[in-house]
Amino acid sequence: MYQPDFPTVPFRLGLYPVVDSVAWIERLLEAGVRTIQLRIKDKRDEEVEADVIAAIALGRRYNARLFINDYWRLAIKHRAYGVHLGQEDLETTDLKAIQAAGLRLGVSTHNDMEIDVALAAKPSYIALGHVFPTQTKQMPSAPQGLAQLASHIERLADYPTVAIGGISLERAPAVLATGVGSIAVVSAITQAADWREATAELLAIAGVGDE
């Protein structure tokens, strides 16, 4: 039963690019994306604050769902749409502060045990990964594959879910066929020969999400 402690999100968030710069945020919002995440790693808050401010402003301009990865204090301070946290961040984050600020929360998971941890936090959505091998970041866990993803989707029922990890244009239809609400992509867009074409094709498959 989907009863999060944080504001709800649509079951279908649509195509959900995860990018590391404001430039990518802007060009993808201009291209029609309406759910997006800014993920800048391993910098101090003061080093990324200007980027967070700019990304949130763009999200508002395009009426988009803009999630900030990890930098939850800045997301609260500048009132982002939401925050995305990894498992390792849950214990060190003031979830009640995020909740009190009215921000949505997404949480990464990689197996059933981590799904249990995520469900205990009652986030707005749960990310499931990595589905396929990925070069975007080092992963300690093995790829889950489509059968395991489908099993997680069945377990989570009406909970909004996002599949992530090695999802290409060619693989996207099979991933969505598991019943997952949304697909997060990184290199399928940022490393595409023509990112505009790749984005348009992925939007045609995954949509922009429900209101």
From Swiss-Prot:
Binding positions for 4-amino-2-methyl-5-(diphosphooxymethyl)pyrimidine per the UniProt entry: Q37, L38, R39, I40, K41, N69, S108, K137
GO MF entries: magnesium ion binding; thiamine-phosphate diphosphorylase activity
Function in brief: Condenses 4-methyl-5-(beta-hydroxyethyl)thiazole monophosphate (THZ-P) and 2-methyl-4-amino-5-hydroxymethyl pyrimidine pyrophosphate (HMP-PP) to form thiamine monophosphate (TMP).
Record-linked HAMAP family: TMP_synthase (MF_00097)
Positions with a binding annotation for 2-[(2R,5Z)-2-carboxy-4-methylthiazol-5(2H)-ylidene]ethyl phosphate: T134, Q135, T136, G166, V186, S187
GO cellular component entries: cytoplasm
Origin species: Salmonella paratyphi B (strain ATCC BAA-1250 / SPB7)
Originating gene: thiE
The keyword Acetylation belongs to this UniProt entry's keyword annotation: no
Keyword Nucleotide-binding: no
Name under which the protein is recorded: Thiamine-phosphate synthase
A Pfam family reported for this protein in Swiss-Prot or TrEMBL: TMP-TENI
